């Protein structure tokens, strides 16, 4: 029966992947019907906290986008990339990493990918190199963002173990960023000469490759103000979450918990942007970040609920099987999280499904934090939206998905970045805890 239940979970996930987009969440609901109504499993916990945090953060980001703030950030990113075009392989992941770090969602990378592709092409660099690292960096940065649902959940799970919110960020930010930079350095050592790519030459001969110059940017009246308001909102979240942590204790017995506070601050941020940037609030519903964020909520609802249902119904079996393995080989947790996130399609959903089980197995905080970056393996299956966008935006053909599905340019940078980040985590975490 256990094997059949696993097959049901995998079948639901693969059906969702095949249908694409929001259907990953839909298929999770189908899997729940089979597991609960068909096989008699008790429904697991719905990740309401994760979903509401994503909704709140996306509401603020979408308001900033409508105000022109996101375009302003992309303009700054383009200026940076064009100021040092020869270093595009290093600057591309820097841009997407920090945009995700600030926004709490990797969907902000959509806006920068066309710029990265253009600058790389103009420099004769295979766009696949900076694009692949940039996409991976935008996924890994989720595990270091102060306002991402994954980090907020992880912080809450670790607090009873004596690890504060600020400690978690102090470990995750440098280890993941350095991991991405080392990966960029390694990838830059390989052949990045676009002119020697046979597919590129073929596409040039057919007139399928176009060079575009720098786009003209005109800032909306409230663009800079919306960015400032959003940054102040993030700082407020970090300050409050730090102040209520047991390690700092500036606020004793807080009335509002961390999750609720983030929702309050982000919705307030959206309100202030709407008031002072004078945006059309109806336009928020059509913003690309709002649509992708709400899609993410449905996906998290479906796959995280499905995953938690399976795990919670077999937690004792999992403890018995995995306890001894993790005790002797703690790094195996990172591998488990890697493959789980590949299927669950969400950092927050993966953390929500497996971190409580790892804590129940008495996995130590160092291992938990060091392995956290491994929940970012969303690049393995070439169906994630930012990955597909990178493929579509590269008209040179260098960023392409092979016939065997897994042979695409995101695999090597992704595995390297996660592996290095996890290794650095095992070095840095014992020092800071």
From Swiss-Prot:
One of its GO terms (molecular function) is C4-dicarboxylate transmembrane transporter activity. It is a multi-pass membrane protein. It holds the Pfam family DcuA_DcuB. The chain crosses the membrane at residues 19-39, 50-70, 90-110, 133-153, 166-186, 225-245, 261-281, 292-312, 320-340, 368-388, 411-431. InterPro entries: Anaer_Dcu_memb_transpt (IPR004668). GO terms for cellular component: plasma membrane. It comes from the Bacteria. Keywords: Cell inner membrane, Cell membrane, Membrane, Transmembrane, Transmembrane helix, Transport. It is found in: Cell inner membrane. The keyword Glycosyltransferase does not apply. PANTHER family: ANAEROBIC C4-DICARBOXYLATE TRANSPORTER DCUB (PTHR36106), C4-DICARBOXYLATE TRANSPORTER DCUA (PTHR36106:SF2). Responsible for the transport of C4-dicarboxylates. Belongs to the DcuA/DcuB transporter (TC 2.A.13.1) family. This is C4-dicarboxylate transporter DcuA. It comes from Wolinella succinogenes (strain ATCC 29543 / DSM 1740 / CCUG 13145 / JCM 31913 / LMG 7466 / NCTC 11488 / FDC 602W) (Vibrio succinogenes).
């Amino acid at each position: 029966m256990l094997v059949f239940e696993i097959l049901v979970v995998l079948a639901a996930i693969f059906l969702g992947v095949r249908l694409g987009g929001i259907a990953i969440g839909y298929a999770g609901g189908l899997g729940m019907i089979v597991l609960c109504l068909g096989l008699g499993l008790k429904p697991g916990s719905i990740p309401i906290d994760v979903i509401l945090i994503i909704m709140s953060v996306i509401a603020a980001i979408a308001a900033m986008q409508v105000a022109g703030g996101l375009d302003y950030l992309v303009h700054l990113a383009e200026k940076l990339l064009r100021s040092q075009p020869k270093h595009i392989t290093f600057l591309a992941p820097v841009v997407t990493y920090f945009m995700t770090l600030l926004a709490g969602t990797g969907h902000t990378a959509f806006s920068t990918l066309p710029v990265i592709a253009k600058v790389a092409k103009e420099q004769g660099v295979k766009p696949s190199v900076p694009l692949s690292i940039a996409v991976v960096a935008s996924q890994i940065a989720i595990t270091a963002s102060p306002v991402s649902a994954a980090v907020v959940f992880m912080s809450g799970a670790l607090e009873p173990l004596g690890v504060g919110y600020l400690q978690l960020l102090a470990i995750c930010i440098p280890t993941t960023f350095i991991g991405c930079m080392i990966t960029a350095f390694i990838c830059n050592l390989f052949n990045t000469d676009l002119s020697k790519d046979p597919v590129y030459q073929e596409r040039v001969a057919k007139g399928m490759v176009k060079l575009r110059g720098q786009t003209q940017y005109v800032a909306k009246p409230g663009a800079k103000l919306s960015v400032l308001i959003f940054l102040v909102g993030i700082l407020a979240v970090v300050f409050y979450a730090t102040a209520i942590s047991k390690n700092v204790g500036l606020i004793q017995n807080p009335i509002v918990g961390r999750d609720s506070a983030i929702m309050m601050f982000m919705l307030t941020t959206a309100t202030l942007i709407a008031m002072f940037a004078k945006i059309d609030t109806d336009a928020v519903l059509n913003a690309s970040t709002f649509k992708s964020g709400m899609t993410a909520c449905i996906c998290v609802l479906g796959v995280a609920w499905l995953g938690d249902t399976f795990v919670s119904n077999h937690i004792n079996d999992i403890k018995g099987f995995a306890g001894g393995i993790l005790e002797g080989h703690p790094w195996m947790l990172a591998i488990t999280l890697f493959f789980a996130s590949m299927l669950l399609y969400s950092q927050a959903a993966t953390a929500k499904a497996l971190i409580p089980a790892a804590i129940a197995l008495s996995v130590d905080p160092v291992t938990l934090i060091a392995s956290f970056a491994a929940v970012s393996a969303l690049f393995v299956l070439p169906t994630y939206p930012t990955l597909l966008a990178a493929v579509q935006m590269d008209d040179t053909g260098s960023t392409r998905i092979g016939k065997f599905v897994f042979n695409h340019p995101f695999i090597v940078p992704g595995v390297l970045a996660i592996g290095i980040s996890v290794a650095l985590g095992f070095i840095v975490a014992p020092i800071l805890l």
